[in-house]
Protein backbone atom coordinates (compact mmCIF):
# COMPACT_ATOMS: atom_id res chain seq x y z
CA UNK A 1 0.00 0.00 0.00
CA UNK A 2 1.23 3.49 -0.91
CA UNK A 3 0.05 6.09 1.56
CA UNK A 4 0.39 9.84 1.99
CA UNK A 5 -1.39 12.19 4.36
CA UNK A 6 -4.37 12.39 2.02
CA UNK A 7 -4.15 9.43 -0.35
CA UNK A 8 -4.14 5.67 -0.01
CA UNK A 9 -3.48 3.38 -2.98
CA UNK A 10 -3.21 -0.40 -2.98
CA UNK A 11 -0.95 -2.27 -5.36
CA UNK A 12 -2.74 -5.58 -5.89
CA UNK A 13 -5.26 -7.06 -3.49
CA UNK A 14 -4.25 -10.60 -2.56
CA UNK A 15 -6.13 -13.24 -0.57
CA UNK A 16 -4.72 -12.01 2.77
CA UNK A 17 -5.86 -8.42 2.16
CA UNK A 18 -8.46 -8.53 4.94
CA UNK A 19 -6.00 -9.92 7.48
CA UNK A 20 -3.41 -7.27 6.62
CA UNK A 21 -5.91 -4.40 6.74
CA UNK A 22 -7.25 -5.35 10.18
CA UNK A 23 -3.97 -3.92 11.48
CA UNK A 24 -4.41 -0.60 9.65
CA UNK A 25 -6.65 2.42 10.30
CA UNK A 26 -10.02 2.17 8.58
CA UNK A 27 -9.99 4.97 6.03
CA UNK A 28 -10.73 5.55 2.38
CA UNK A 29 -8.92 3.65 -0.37
CA UNK A 30 -8.41 6.02 -3.31
CA UNK A 31 -7.42 3.39 -5.84
CA UNK A 32 -6.25 -0.16 -6.48
CA UNK A 33 -3.46 -0.75 -9.01
CA UNK A 34 -3.50 -4.27 -10.47
CA UNK A 35 -0.26 -5.75 -11.78
CA UNK A 36 -2.05 -8.81 -13.22
CA UNK A 37 -5.04 -10.98 -12.41
CA UNK A 38 -3.46 -14.13 -11.00
CA UNK A 39 -5.32 -15.17 -7.87
CA UNK A 40 -2.49 -14.40 -5.45
CA UNK A 41 -2.70 -10.77 -6.59
CA UNK A 42 -6.47 -10.22 -6.80
CA UNK A 43 -7.98 -12.94 -4.62
CA UNK A 44 -8.90 -10.44 -1.90
CA UNK A 45 -10.70 -8.00 -4.16
CA UNK A 46 -14.13 -8.90 -2.76
CA UNK A 47 -12.91 -7.79 0.67
CA UNK A 48 -12.70 -4.15 -0.40
CA UNK A 49 -16.46 -3.95 0.10
CA UNK A 50 -16.27 -2.39 3.63
CA UNK A 51 -14.20 0.43 2.14
CA UNK A 52 -17.03 1.21 -0.27
CA UNK A 53 -18.59 2.94 2.72
CA UNK A 54 -16.46 5.87 1.55
CA UNK A 55 -17.72 5.59 -2.04
CA UNK A 56 -16.98 3.73 -5.25
CA UNK A 57 -13.40 2.46 -5.52
CA UNK A 58 -11.35 3.01 -8.66
CA UNK A 59 -9.47 -0.09 -9.81
CA UNK A 60 -6.78 0.34 -12.48
CA UNK A 61 -5.72 -2.58 -14.69
CA UNK A 62 -4.54 -3.25 -18.21
CA UNK A 63 -7.01 -4.58 -20.77
CA UNK A 64 -6.25 -8.25 -20.14
CA UNK A 65 -6.45 -8.01 -16.35
CA UNK A 66 -9.60 -5.88 -16.52
CA UNK A 67 -11.28 -8.59 -18.60
CA UNK A 68 -10.14 -11.24 -16.11
CA UNK A 69 -11.62 -9.26 -13.22
CA UNK A 70 -14.96 -8.97 -15.00
CA UNK A 71 -15.00 -12.76 -15.39
CA UNK A 72 -13.93 -13.41 -11.81
CA UNK A 73 -16.37 -10.95 -10.22
CA UNK A 74 -19.31 -10.59 -12.63
CA UNK A 75 -21.63 -9.63 -9.77
CA UNK A 76 -19.68 -6.35 -9.41
CA UNK A 77 -20.33 -5.26 -12.99
CA UNK A 78 -23.99 -6.08 -13.61
CA UNK A 79 -26.41 -3.37 -14.64
CA UNK A 80 -28.41 -3.78 -11.44
CA UNK A 81 -26.06 -4.42 -8.54
CA UNK A 82 -27.11 -6.55 -5.60
CA UNK A 83 -27.01 -4.51 -2.36
CA UNK A 84 -23.72 -4.83 -0.53
CA UNK A 85 -21.48 -5.96 -3.38
CA UNK A 86 -18.19 -4.10 -3.84
CA UNK A 87 -18.74 -0.93 -5.82
CA UNK A 88 -15.88 -0.91 -8.30
CA UNK A 89 -15.15 1.48 -11.14
CA UNK A 90 -12.81 -0.42 -13.44
CA UNK A 91 -10.35 1.79 -15.34
CA UNK A 92 -8.31 0.35 -18.21
CA UNK A 93 -4.77 1.72 -18.22
CA UNK A 94 -1.93 1.57 -20.72
CA UNK A 95 1.82 1.22 -20.10
CA UNK A 96 3.81 4.45 -20.40
CA UNK A 97 0.71 6.61 -20.00
CA UNK A 98 0.84 8.51 -16.71
CA UNK A 99 -2.13 8.25 -14.39
CA UNK A 100 -2.85 10.51 -11.44
CA UNK A 101 -4.58 9.65 -8.19
CA UNK A 102 -4.83 12.84 -6.15
CA UNK A 103 -1.23 14.02 -5.74
CA UNK A 104 0.34 10.71 -6.82
CA UNK A 105 1.68 10.51 -10.38
CA UNK A 106 1.99 6.87 -11.41
CA UNK A 107 3.78 5.50 -14.46
CA UNK A 108 2.82 1.95 -15.49
CA UNK A 109 5.54 -0.07 -17.20
CA UNK A 110 5.55 -3.52 -18.77
CA UNK A 111 7.50 -6.48 -17.43
CA UNK A 112 7.26 -10.12 -18.45
CA UNK A 113 5.92 -12.85 -16.17
CA UNK A 114 7.23 -15.68 -18.33
CA UNK A 115 5.24 -14.99 -21.54
CA UNK A 116 2.59 -12.86 -19.86
CA UNK A 117 3.01 -9.06 -20.02
CA UNK A 118 2.11 -7.54 -16.66
CA UNK A 119 2.43 -4.11 -15.08
CA UNK A 120 4.97 -2.58 -12.75
CA UNK A 121 4.48 0.88 -11.28
CA UNK A 122 6.78 3.84 -10.82
CA UNK A 123 5.60 6.38 -8.25
CA UNK A 124 8.10 9.21 -7.95
CA UNK A 125 11.45 7.59 -7.11
CA UNK A 126 9.81 4.32 -6.02
CA UNK A 127 9.57 1.37 -8.41
CA UNK A 128 7.29 -1.56 -7.55
CA UNK A 129 7.59 -4.75 -9.59
CA UNK A 130 6.30 -8.22 -8.82
CA UNK A 131 6.29 -11.55 -10.67
CA UNK A 132 8.87 -10.37 -13.20
CA UNK A 133 11.20 -12.68 -15.08
CA UNK A 134 12.45 -10.29 -17.77
CA UNK A 135 12.11 -6.64 -18.75
CA UNK A 136 12.55 -5.08 -22.18
CA UNK A 137 15.40 -2.64 -22.79
CA UNK A 138 12.91 0.05 -23.80
CA UNK A 139 11.33 -0.01 -20.34
CA UNK A 140 14.56 1.13 -18.70
CA UNK A 141 13.96 4.64 -20.06
CA UNK A 142 10.94 4.93 -17.78
CA UNK A 143 12.74 3.93 -14.59
CA UNK A 144 15.77 6.19 -14.63
CA UNK A 145 16.43 7.94 -11.32
CA UNK A 146 14.83 5.29 -9.11
CA UNK A 147 15.93 5.47 -5.47
CA UNK A 148 13.79 2.73 -3.89
CA UNK A 149 13.07 -0.61 -5.56
CA UNK A 150 10.60 -3.27 -4.46
CA UNK A 151 11.01 -6.36 -6.62
CA UNK A 152 10.26 -10.07 -6.54
CA UNK A 153 12.97 -12.58 -5.64
CA UNK A 154 11.48 -16.05 -5.35
CA UNK A 155 14.43 -18.01 -3.93
CA UNK A 156 18.17 -18.55 -4.29
CA UNK A 157 17.87 -21.62 -6.52
CA UNK A 158 16.89 -23.40 -8.68
CA UNK A 159 15.98 -21.08 -11.51
CA UNK A 160 12.30 -20.44 -12.19
CA UNK A 161 10.59 -19.99 -15.55
CA UNK A 162 8.44 -16.98 -14.58
CA UNK A 163 9.96 -15.32 -11.49
CA UNK A 164 13.33 -13.76 -10.74
CA UNK A 165 15.57 -15.66 -8.36
CA UNK A 166 17.90 -13.80 -6.01
CA UNK A 167 20.89 -13.56 -8.37
CA UNK A 168 18.69 -12.16 -11.13
CA UNK A 169 16.96 -9.72 -8.78
CA UNK A 170 20.35 -8.47 -7.58
CA UNK A 171 21.46 -7.95 -11.19
CA UNK A 172 18.29 -5.99 -11.89
CA UNK A 173 18.76 -3.85 -8.77
CA UNK A 174 22.27 -2.96 -9.95
CA UNK A 175 20.93 -2.03 -13.40
CA UNK A 176 18.29 0.21 -11.86
CA UNK A 177 20.82 1.84 -9.53
CA UNK A 178 18.46 2.05 -6.56
CA UNK A 179 20.05 2.92 -3.22
CA UNK A 180 17.54 0.69 -1.40
CA UNK A 181 16.08 -2.59 -2.62
CA UNK A 182 13.46 -4.75 -0.93
CA UNK A 183 12.79 -8.30 -2.07
CA UNK A 184 9.21 -9.51 -1.99
CA UNK A 185 7.11 -12.38 -3.41
CA UNK A 186 9.38 -14.84 -1.61
CA UNK A 187 8.71 -18.58 -1.40
CA UNK A 188 9.00 -20.74 1.72
CA UNK A 189 12.30 -22.22 0.53
CA UNK A 190 14.20 -18.92 0.77
CA UNK A 191 15.38 -19.45 4.36
CA UNK A 192 15.10 -17.58 7.64
CA UNK A 193 14.68 -13.81 7.37
CA UNK A 194 17.68 -12.70 9.44
CA UNK A 195 19.99 -15.33 7.96
CA UNK A 196 19.09 -14.36 4.41
CA UNK A 197 19.52 -10.64 5.11
CA UNK A 198 23.07 -11.31 6.31
CA UNK A 199 23.85 -12.85 2.92
CA UNK A 200 22.52 -9.92 0.90
CA UNK A 201 24.67 -6.94 -0.10
CA UNK A 202 24.42 -3.52 1.53
CA UNK A 203 21.20 -1.73 0.64
CA UNK A 204 19.30 -4.94 -0.15
CA UNK A 205 17.02 -6.78 2.26
CA UNK A 206 13.95 -8.97 2.44
CA UNK A 207 10.67 -7.15 2.92
CA UNK A 208 8.21 -8.30 5.60
CA UNK A 209 4.50 -7.99 6.32
CA UNK A 210 3.58 -4.64 7.82
CA UNK A 211 6.87 -2.99 6.91
CA UNK A 212 6.83 0.78 6.39
CA UNK A 213 9.19 2.28 3.80
CA UNK A 214 9.54 6.05 3.50
CA UNK A 215 10.91 7.60 0.32
Predicted features along the sequence, with ranges:
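Cap/insert and terminal regions of metallo-dependent hydrolase folds
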Residues: 135-215
Amino acid sequence: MVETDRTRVLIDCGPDFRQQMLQQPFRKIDGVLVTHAHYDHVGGMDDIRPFCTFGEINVYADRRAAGNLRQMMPYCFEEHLYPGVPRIHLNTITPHRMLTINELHIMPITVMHDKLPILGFRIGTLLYITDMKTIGHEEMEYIKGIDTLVVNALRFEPDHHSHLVVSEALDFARRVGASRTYFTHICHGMGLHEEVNRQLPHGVQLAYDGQTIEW
